[in-house]
Design a protein with these regions (language model features):
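Short beta-strand/loop segment at the start of cytosolic alpha/beta domains
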Residues: 1-18
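Inter-domain helical "communication" segments and dimerization helices
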Residues: 8-12, 39-41, 106
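Amphipathic alpha-helical interaction surfaces in cytosolic regulatory modules
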Residues: 25-99
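Acidic phosphotransfer microenvironment of two-component signaling modules
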Residues: 85, 106-107
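Short acidic-hydrophobic, aromatic-tinged amphipathic segments that line or gate anion-handling sites
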Residues: 100-105
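Receiver (REC) domain switch/output surface
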Residues: 112-113
Length: 113
């Protein structure tokens, strides 16, 4: 998984995750380590680019929602970009959908302003 960290608007640090392929429960463990490191480091703003993801396990969606709640507790957020219609359906079928979706990284960055 490729990860970038950049300084964005209002001096907020925004991290990017760019996973690829299928995000399974086992595959989520790598992402989870990075999410925990972000929290420990005081970084609470994340954009996940799903343009290279072919499938996401529904249990992973639940875990992402839990992390989003943790980030929001500290004034941050997790936002998604480049979500295919297939992935959107998986996310929507989870029952509720708290994530903001943007068509591009630039649009998501602006939303953190």
């Amino acid at each position: 998984m490729k990860i970038q960290a950049v300084e964005a608007m209002n001096d907020k640090k925004i991290s990017f995750f760019l996973p690829s392929g299928e995000i399974s429960e086992d595959g989520f463990s790598e992402m989870e380590l990075k999410l925990k490191a972000m929290i420990e480091g005081g970084d609470f703003n994340l954009i996940i680019d799903l343009s290279r993801v072919s499938h996401i396990n529904y249990k992973v969606v639940g875990s992402l929602i839990e992390y989003q709640q943790k980030f929001k507790k500290y004034g941050g957020d997790i936002k998604l970009v480049n979500v295919s219609p297939y992935l959107y359906d998986i996310l929507r079928l989870y029952g509720f959908y708290p994530f903001e979706i943007y068509p591009s990284r630039r649009a998501a960055l602006k939303s953190f302003a």
